Design a protein with these regions (language model features):
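A cross-family phosphate/adenosyl-ligand binding-site feature
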Residues: 18-207
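Cysteine-centered motifs
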Residues: 9-11
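Ala/Thr-enriched low-complexity intrinsically disordered regions
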Residues: 6-7, 21
């Protein structure tokens, strides 16, 4: 008799998430190094086409101060939410975002999301995105990874999240740190369904 694992059972019921052209999107920043990734994502989301919300963990604010000269620059109309306020619309399943990106994502945040912790609005929004079957993209930067990290990623993948590690592409001919960051951000935009030419595509270069 054939044995079915829990993983195979869960995978069989995960359906592709179809995103609208005009997104209500939440960009969440945690305390991992790599604030530039979040800044470049915000730079390339058109506020005339998308409703943009931002939330930051306490340590994210410290990283922003250390890594982004002049601080985080928000698109026109973007709303910055209080981490401790549960009055944000995406804190309820009745008004979830179309998509949420945690960029960069610490392993601590990933572990809390994987196990359903919701002690602040960032974690609650991720919990809502999962339970309402909305697009959730997590961009971890940690290396190397422990077995605990891998198991947490497995749980999140089975729950429907996308794990998109911040691994820059070096075939793009990048000349600056921003160019390298853009190769990651381009993949995030791709998974959001946002058309972009932020980084060269494979085989676009002259043969």
């Amino acid at each position: 008799m054939r044995n079915f694992s829990a993983a195979s059972c869960f995978c069989s019921v995960i359906w592709p998430i179809i995103l609208p052209a005009n997104l209500k999107i939440l960009v969440a920043m945690t305390g991992a190094s790599g604030a530039l990734y979040a800044q470049r994502l915000l730079d390339n989301l058109n506020p005339r086409e998308h409703e943009i919300h931002v939330v930051q963990s306490n340590y994210a604010q410290q990283v922003i101060a250390e890594e982004l000269a002049g601080g985080l620059k928000l698109p026109d109309g973007a709303k910055l939410h209080n981490l401790k306020s549960m009055n944000a619309p995406f804190a309820s399943g009745s008004n979830p975002p179309d998509a949420m990106v945690v960029i960069p994502c610490t392993m601590g945040t990933m572990g809390r999301i994987a196990h359903g912790y919701s002690e602040d609005v960032l974690l609650r929004a991720a919990d809502v995105a999962l339970k309402e079957k909305r697009k959730l993209i997590l961009v971890p930067r940690e290396t190397p990874l422990s077995l605990v990290h891998i198991k947490n990623m497995e749980l999140l993948l089975l729950a429907g999240a996308t794990i998109l590690p911040a691994n820059p592409s070096f075939y793009s001919g990048a000349k600056t740190i921003v160019d390298l960051a853009d190769t990651v951000v381009a993949r995030v935009l791709d998974h959001l369904g946002v058309k972009n030419d932020l980084a060269p595509r494979w085989s676009e270069e002259k043969e």
